């Protein structure tokens, strides 16, 4: 078999080190031939016993599985691997292979799988890809004594996966009983599940335990199910020590229990008389979870303080991870029993670094508590911190804001005579994530009376800074102000919330909705310009035209305004006729299809039907001025200077369009993290009116490219409105109706060039918007009733417009024409292209 390089390294390192230490240690190689299965084997299982005083090394050359021992009808009273009392160290060197014990029913053996009688010697299992102890023995063996039992020390080191499950002992340590020191370190995956002891330590019993995670570490469902049982997962012997370090993975204690039927309670760890925790720490990004409490045997206090998240002396490593004590996994019935929620230590506790979290109504009890500035203590309402003999001194107390509405209180107690409670910095309202400020209850003001209760034997000292409150705010969601008020005797504190406003997230805002009115604005102006274009050309009595029309509007993004784009296209049909009085009447209809997008979450599809009516009156400039001057001296002075042949036109136009919108919203709502697409429909309309006049000046000099110059001035008004609507989907919002009003006075000049069968003109104009109401609407998030003004873009109020048109005659009855227009504003660009044909008669 080809062995991976990493496994060779794993096996080489301990082998070399052991060789240096043991010198003449006995070495035996194990391979697949050493496997045994009692259900298929024709021979009885033979245990291996080590007696070499210099120690024994078992070197694995292949994976080994020992299962179903003994054979049916036989008994097994000796450990599968035994180390005699006079023997040296016992080492199992995995070399990257697996080692499995399963269903080992050794009736009286101290350690069904591995037993060592050698005091002050060490049993080591290292370098395995998988190391498993399963039902060794199972609980069906009424006098079993665990999977591993050593009278010296034990080390489980540098294994990829360790699974220790469903083992049983009538004595201490359902899976492991170690009289000396037990070291478990750098295992990439470690699980103690469903192990059981009739006395102490459902999974582990030892004098001294060093537990350092190399990956996820789980203690789940272990139990000491007797009235005298202690330590559902781990029991530390009297005067022993416990060090727990979440160095490279989370450590979880969950569902571990003690007690006989009817008196079952949760217990993660039990500390024997005068036993102590020497280290409880987690590295950055890792957490130690105590869903079951820590208990103590006896009442003797320990002098050494527990410095949480503190490195060993001389070690510069920083521990900034999180330690969680939680009752969240308890059933409602279990939570009623305070024993299931109370962790007790007979030491002073100092919060040195990182974060300690109390959740789910737990009580953390110790001799006294102190806190360094680099650490945080986060407490849910309903949790308690109890100092039994000393004071409580806190510098960074944080209240979990998510628990504010549970109707409970945080309690700090240092009730021993002459002991104080001191809070030196402002209380902080902590949030787990910014989505808290999306909660609908923040839509109203609230007061949470007496949520912090203090009970001291002597003084309660609240520094001047601590009489204020620091709240972790979010730039999104409900905005408001948090305040804290202390009672006269400082024994209670009340926290209040005053709402101010609501700020939507980028996903909630949807500025595309009001910006759709700018699309209607562009489309109706382009339509009106096309009707004017349809009347251009040779002066026939009647004409009918059909054409395609397209428009593009691009609005650039700004710091507080999202960019968007509007694209539309469709068909226009129209007709014009010269009336008996010489006026020209034009009529047109259009159907447009549009697509709008905000380059983020929203895309709109629209369909517009529009109609327009245009009336043009042609006269000489002389007759117009004559009417305007009326009778009097001014007429006689000015009128002689006015040309009697210069043509002048007056025109008016009125247009109406109805639009049906269908918007698509794509969102990523948690949970689950799957893309959601929702469609919403609503309607709107647009009115547009225009009045204008122009004077055509013929170039009679013969010089210059253009033959006619036509200055003009217009007054354009556009009013667009869209209905209110409710969007249903992952992000459900209620949008009020919105409107856009714009009044512009374009002025410019048209330059014309005619040929025998062709006709061109170029238009340049300046168009200031003299009066405008920008689009906006009120948006309400239905999930929390948060409401805000969604503002559309504010296009620059001055525009430069250039248009170029061409006409070509196809005989006496037909004409082709095309038009290109470009509008420039400081914040946007728009284009339109039209092309079609006319039939003249």
From Swiss-Prot:
It comes from Chlamydia pneumoniae. Keywords: Cell outer membrane, Cell wall, Membrane, Secreted, Signal, Transmembrane, Transmembrane beta strand. Gene3D superfamilies: Autotransporter beta-domain. The keyword Signal applies. It is found in: Secreted, Cell wall; Cell outer membrane. GO terms for cellular component: cell outer membrane; extracellular region. Residues 1-24 form the signal peptide. The lineage of its organism: Bacteria, Pseudomonadati, Chlamydiota, Chlamydiia, Chlamydiales. This is Probable outer membrane protein pmp2.
